[in-house]
Amino acid sequence: MMADTSLEAYDPDSMATLRHRVYETIKDCPVLSNRDLARILGREPSTISGRTNELCDLGLIRAWDTKKDPTTGKKVKIWEAVA
């Protein structure tokens, strides 16, 4: 069997690694918005929203509720792990 030589195998900030970190964080703390996740993981909210959309498409998380963000005043999704 050959070793994985892809960039993601060596890059701790790869999209696959970040997607996994987002999923694990949502499993541990289910009442989180993308902004909350970004703050916890030290990332930009735009990088988190892409990963949550991917996880939602995969059926691993779902929007549990919405709340009003105190900073922006916008309605935001609150995520929960499905599996």
Locate each region found by the language model.
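Short alpha-helical segments that sit at the start of domains
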Residues: M1-T25
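Short intrinsically disordered terminal tails
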Residues: M1-M2, D28, E80-A83
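Short amphipathic alpha-helical interaction segments
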Residues: R43-D57, K68
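A short acidic, leucine-rich amphipathic alpha-helix
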Residues: N34-L41
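Short, cationic-aromatic polyanion-contact patches
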Residues: P12, R62-A83
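Short capping segments at the starts of secondary-structure elements
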Residues: K27-S33
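DNA-binding alpha-helical recognition surfaces that contact promoter or target DNA
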Residues: E24, R39, G50
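Ser/Thr-centric signal marking residues that sit
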Residues: T17-L18, S33, T47, T52, ...
